[in-house]
A protein has these predicted regions:
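Glycine- and acidic-residue-biased ligand/ion/polar-headgroup-sensing regions
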Residues: 59-83
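Histidine-centered metal-chelating micro-motifs
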Residues: 51-54, 72, 98-102, 106-112
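A short, N-terminal "cap"/entry segment at the start of jelly-roll beta-barrel domains
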Residues: 1-40, 54, 93, 138-154
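Residue-level recognition of conserved beta-strand positions in structured domain cores
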Residues: 44, 57, 75-77, 114, ...
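A short hydrophobic beta-strand segment most commonly corresponding to one strand
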Residues: 63, 103, 118-139
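Short acidic-glycine-tyrosine-enriched beta hairpin
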Residues: 78-107
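Conserved short histidine dyad/triad with adjacent acidic residue
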Residues: 41-58, 106
Length: 154
């Protein structure tokens, strides 16, 4: 079949996720497997009660499309040469509102999620697979979101 579709708001396949990647409760619906996409991983991500991602970096580009609520995307610069336990400094804080589309270049240290502790925030995440290894990789860090990125979360 040349075309497959899925409704974002139907009962999609729920992806099991590591809760250590987030600050509070998050659900992730799988889209790419349902439609058979091989060039990118696509998820519909729901952040409850002010939840956001832990600090992380991808080896491929990422696109976020806001589908509900108000969120925030923050980028950081790295201070130091270590793979773990290095200093950070916030470089951008960007409001994410319904309909917004954000492009995050590979290698950008960042976090994103809900800006409201009382309302649900959701977005589509499109992770564009790197052409060389065809596997998208994300490195997650413990962090205070201000000055320090700590240990890598396994």
């Amino acid at each position: 079949m040349d075309v497959k579709k899925v409704n974002l708001f139907s009962n999609s396949k729920i992806r099991k996720i590591n809760p250590d990647w987030f600050t509070a409760k998050v659900h992730m619906a799988e889209i790419s497997d349902v439609i058979g996409s091989k060039e990118q991983n696509i998820y519909h991500v729901y952040f409850e009660n002010g939840a956001k991602t832990k600090l992380h970096v991808h080896d491929g580009n990422q696109i976020l499309i806001v589908t509900r609520g108000n969120g925030v995307l923050e980028t950081f610069s790295k201070r130091g040469r270590g793979k773990e336990n290095f200093g950070i400094r916030r470089t951008k804080k960007i409001a994410l509102n319904l309909g917004d589309v954000a492009y995050i270049k590979k290698g950008t240290l960042h976090t994103h999620g809900s800006a409201d502790k009382k309302r649900l925030f959701s977005h589509i995440a499109i992770n564009i697979l790197p052409p060389k290894n065809k596997k998208y990789s994300t490195t997650w860090y413990e962090s205070d979101f201000k000055t320090l990125a700590g240990n890598i979360i396994k």
